[in-house]
């Protein structure tokens, strides 16, 4: 499933090369969390025969060394489980301003560098991205994943219901 402005003929070979590079650097095997709207599962020949798993993104990220994020809400799991993130895009994806801004906004927020998978990146650059600021992850949780209210969830819901139906 590909909701990005890219062609499979360019995107998948570049992604396969990037995965191979990471596997070599970190001596591990990349496992792909398939998009929930797809039925792609099992061995994907167009991605180097890597395993794709469906509906197990949270579990995969929880047990991972890092997460490779392509404009995905899966970022939330990486934040919650404090996993390093690689924010990736391609030359084609750069042409979609909304998509590219999304990647850049995330890399700015987390004070990291996004990776263009169509360009070469040194091993030292890749390894430097493994280090992340846990405080920024906490800030993200507070800014985007929780309520600003100090009340407990049941109090927020009760207050809402009272305002809507009883007052």
Go through each PLM region and give its residues.
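Catalytic binding pocket for nucleotide-activated donors in carbohydrate/polymer assembly enzymes
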Residues: 40-50, 73-148
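Short beta-strand/turn micro-motifs composed of small residues
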Residues: 32-34, 69, 87-89
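Acidic, amphipathic alpha-helical patches
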Residues: 56-58
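Conserved catalytic-core segment of nucleotide-activated headgroup transferases in glycan assembly
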Residues: 1-42
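C-terminal alpha-helical cap of glycosyltransferases
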Residues: 145-167
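Flexible glycine/serine/alanine-rich "lid" or loop that lines and gates the nucleotide-sugar donor pocket
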Residues: 61-62, 80
């Amino acid at each position: 499933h590909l909701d990005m402005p890219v062609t499979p003929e360019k995107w998948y070979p570049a992604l396969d090369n990037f995965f191979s590079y990471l596997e070599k650097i970190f001596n591990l095997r990349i496992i792909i969390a398939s998009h929930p709207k797809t039925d792609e599962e099992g061995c994907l020949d167009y991605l180097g025969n890597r395993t794709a798993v469906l509906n197990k993104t949270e579990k995969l990220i929880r047990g991972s060394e890092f997460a490779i994020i392509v404009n995905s809400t899966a970022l939330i799991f990486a934040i919650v489980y404090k996993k390093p993130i690689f924010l990736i895009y391609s030359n084609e994806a750069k042409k979609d301003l909304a998509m590219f801004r999304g990647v850049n906004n995330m890399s700015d927020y987390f004070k990291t560098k996004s990776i263009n998978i169509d360009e070469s990146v040194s091993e030292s650059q890749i390894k430097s991205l493994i280090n992340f600021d846990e405080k920024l992850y906490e800030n993200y949780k507070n800014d985007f994943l929780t309520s600003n209210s100090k009340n407990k969830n049941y109090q927020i819901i009760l207050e809402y219901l009272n305002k809507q139906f009883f007052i």
